[in-house]
A protein has these predicted regions:
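Noncatalytic modules at the cell exterior or secretory-pathway interfaces
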Residues: 5-7, 55-75
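Beta-rich globular "head" domains
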Residues: 1-26, 84-88
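Short, surface-exposed beta-strand/loop "edge" segments at domain boundaries and coil↔beta transitions
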Residues: 16-17, 28-30, 72-74
């Protein structure tokens, strides 16, 4: 089954987080755990947004300005939104 490692995305400028369904069946090292998404700290227009199984294991060089929590495969309403991106996974 695919393993989802993270998301690369361009952050938008809207102040609310749209609902994002990553996958119906997400498998990986911590499927039952709460995940976090890290935003680059430089403000609107940032191009890096990374989602990881481990809330503390963000991509090197990204300063985490805020966190949005989601459980399982659904992202909850939160602090930042309006992004396009793609899921990084392996087969």
């Amino acid at each position: 089954q695919p393993k989802v490692y993270g998301v690369y995305a361009k952050k938008g400028t809207v102040a609310t987080l749209d609902f994002l369904k990553v996958a119906d069946d997400v498998t990986g090292p911590a499927t039952a755990a709460t995940w976090k998404i890290g935003l680059n700290a430089t403000g609107a227009g940032d191009e890096v947004m990374y989602l990881n199984y481990n809330p503390t294991a963000y991509v090197s060089g990204i300063a985490v300005a805020s966190h949005t929590t989601f459980t399982g495969a659904t992202l909850s309403t939160g602090a930042a939104t309006g992004f396009d991106g793609f899921v990084i996974y392996s087969l």
